[in-house]
C-alpha cells in the first residue's frame, strides 16, 4: 500500500523533487528493485480477457511473463537490475496484512458471484482484488532470474528498506518501487514505473529525497511523522486527516507527539485517534528497520550470462512459452548486459553542491509558486460562490 497521497503532497509542495523522464535516461545504472511489489503488479497487469495467464496445466504464468519481459526491457535500455525480495513482515504490519487478507477473501467471494451473475467489468474488478503474491510465485521468479543471469537478494524484512541501504551505500543508483514508503527508509532516489509495460507509455518518475525534504521544509523525522499521519502499512489512519490536514498539523506542531497533544486538548474534538495507535513503534521501524549492511556478503551480487537451455526447459517446456521468443530474449540479455557495462559520464564527476544563494533562490521560486496556487484556488472558490448566489436565468 505504501503512504497514502504522499506523491500528491510532494508534487504540490516540493515539485523540484520530482523528475519525469524516459527509461533510456537510466542507461548504465544499477537499480535495486522491490521484487514483491513488481510481482504483484505483474499478476494484476499481465492478463488476457480479465484472467491471469495460465499454462496448459492450469498454472498461473502472469508473474513469469511480466518478470521475463519487463526485465528484458530494462536490460535492453542499459539498466542493470537487482531484485530484492521481502523477508518476514514486521510484527506491527501483521494487523494491516490481516485486514488485506480479509478484503481479498471477500473479493474472492464477490468474484465468484460476479462470474455467475455480473458483467465482464465486475468479473475483472473483483478478480484484480483477489491477487496476492505467494511463496510459489516468489520461488518461480527467483528460479527465472537465476536462469536469466539477473541477481537477487533476500531482505530480512522489508525489501524497500534493504533497497534503500544499497542506494545510500552507492552500490546502486536508486531504489525502484511503486511504494512511496521507500522514501521513509531514506533512499536518496526513488524510481517509480520502472517495471511498467512499454504500452502504458508512463514516464519514469525519479524522486529525490533531499529535495523533497527541502521543499517541505522538514527534517527526516518530521517527514516520517507526516507519512505516518497520511497513513502507512503499520497503523490504521486517523479519521478526517487528509493530505492537506496532515501537512498543516506537522508544520504547525513539529512532531507527532505535539500533534496528538493538540488533538487531545482540542475542545472541538474534531479528530479521534484510534485507541491502539503505536506510532512510536511505526516511527522506529522506519528509522531503524531490520536490514543487512551493504557490505554484508549476502548483499554481494553480480550479473551473469543467461542459461539458454535452462530458460527453454523452464519457460517453454514447463510453462508453455513461445520457444522463438524465449531464445530471442536470451540473445538480447547476452548482448545488452555486456553493453550496460559501459560507464555513464556522470560517474567521473562529483556533483557540485548548491550555494546558499542558489538554495535561497530556489526556495523563493517555490514559495512564489505555492502563493500563486493558493491565489488561483481562492479565485476559483470565489467564482464558484458567485455563480451559486447568482439568480437562475441571470446572464
From Swiss-Prot:
The highest taxon in the source lineage is Eukaryota
How is the cofactor bound, as the UniProt entry phrases it? Answer: Binds 2 magnesium ions per subunit. They probably participate in the reaction catalyzed by the enzyme. May bind an additional third magnesium ion after substrate binding.
User: What is this enzyme's EC?
Assistant: 3.1.-.-
Signal peptide residues on this chain, from the entry's feature table: none
GO BP term, example? DNA replication, removal of RNA primer
- Residues in coiled coil: none
What is the required cofactor set for this protein? Mg(2+)
Parts of the chain that traverse the membrane: none
Region Interaction with PCNA, as annotated, extends over 341-349
Annotated Mg(2+) 1 binding sites: 34, 86, 158, 160
Q: What does the record say about PTM?
A: Phosphorylated. Phosphorylation upon DNA damage induces relocalization to the nuclear plasma.
Cite the residue spans of the region called Disordered: 344-395
Keyword terms: DNA damage, DNA repair, DNA replication, Endonuclease, Exonuclease, Hydrolase, Magnesium, Metal-binding, Mitochondrion, Nuclease, Nucleus, Phosphoprotein
- Tell whether Phosphoprotein is among the UniProt keywords: yes
Chain sites annotated for binding Mg(2+) 2: 179, 181, 233
List the molecular function annotations (GO) for this entry: 5'-3' exonuclease activity; 5'-flap endonuclease activity; DNA binding; magnesium ion binding
Q: What does this protein do?
A: Structure-specific nuclease with 5'-flap endonuclease and 5'-3' exonuclease activities involved in DNA replication and repair. During DNA replication, cleaves the 5'-overhanging flap structure that is generated by displacement synthesis when DNA polymerase encounters the 5'-end of a downstream Okazaki fragment. It enters the flap from the 5'-end and then tracks to cleave the flap base, leaving a nick for ligation. Also involved in the long patch base excision repair (LP-BER) pathway, by cleaving within the apurinic/apyrimidinic (AP) site-terminated flap.
Subunit structure, as described in the record:
Interacts with PCNA. Three molecules of fen1 bind to one PCNA trimer with each molecule binding to one PCNA monomer. PCNA stimulates the nuclease activity without altering cleavage specificity.
Family, according to the entry, reads as follows: Belongs to the XPG/RAD2 endonuclease family. FEN1 subfamily.
Q: What is this protein called?
A: Flap endonuclease 1
Q: Which organism is it from?
A: Aspergillus niger (strain ATCC MYA-4892 / CBS 513.88 / FGSC A1513)
**Gene (UniProt):** fen1
